[in-house]
């Protein structure tokens, strides 16, 4: 192999390793068997969610995972592998891909990493069932507001009882 090719591959490994380090979440899938239309729809959905999706050679992924400190992730790089990277939203790649697997049997989640920790297929699927950040914040807000709301209703009920008795 020529030195130019080796240098180019080393550069690719470095680039992918940096993406792995910076990613909030990584989802590795086997997209073998997807039609062109399905692949296009999947890529569009991921792009709209701010997720980068690439098909990368396993040898490059393995070396990049080692450099990024995700050695355990090497086990999922068997057969054709495509990787979804998200830098902001931890849930987005898992949710989009998991939703897509319901309509496209050919797409299979192999595993991934969540905030630097290697995760199994089951953990990625569990992550996909969670609401996004805004949904979680609204749930938290409603939980925090509930006691205040209950006190307000109690005070109002007491006031109405006193008015009715007078």
Swiss-Prot record:
Species: Streptococcus pyogenes serotype M6 (strain ATCC BAA-946 / MGAS10394)
Gene Ontology biological process terms from the UniProt entry: translation
Lineage: Bacteria, Bacillati, Bacillota, Bacilli, Lactobacillales
Highest taxon, organism lineage: Bacteria
Keyword Ribosomal protein: yes
Segment forming the signal sequence: none
HAMAP family assigned to the protein according to its UniProt record, in alphabetical order: Ribosomal_uL10
Protein's name according to its UniProt entry: Large ribosomal subunit protein uL10
Record keywords: Ribonucleoprotein, Ribosomal protein, RNA-binding, rRNA-binding
Family: Belongs to the universal ribosomal protein uL10 family.
């Amino acid at each position: 192999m020529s030195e130019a090719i080796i240098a180019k591959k080393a550069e690719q490994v470095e680039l992918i390793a940096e993406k792995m380090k910076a990613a909030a979440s990584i989802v590795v899938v086997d997209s073998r068997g997807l039609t062109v239309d399905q692949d296009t729809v999947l890529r569009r959905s991921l792009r709209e969610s701010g997720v980068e999706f690439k098909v990368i050679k396993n040898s490059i992924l393995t070396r990049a995972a080692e450099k990024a400190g995700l050695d355990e992730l090497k086990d999922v790089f068997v057969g054709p592998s495509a990787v979804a990277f998200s830098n902001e939203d931890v849930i987005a790649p898992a949710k989009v891909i998991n939703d897509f697997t319901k309509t496209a049997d050919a797409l299979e989640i192999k595993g991934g990493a969540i905030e630097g920790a290697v995760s199994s297929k089951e953990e990625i699927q569990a992550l996909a069932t969670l609401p996004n950040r805004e949904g979680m914040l609204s749930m938290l807000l409603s939980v925090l507001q509930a006691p205040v709301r209950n006190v307000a209703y109690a005070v109002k009920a007491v006031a109405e009882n006193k008015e009715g008795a007078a």
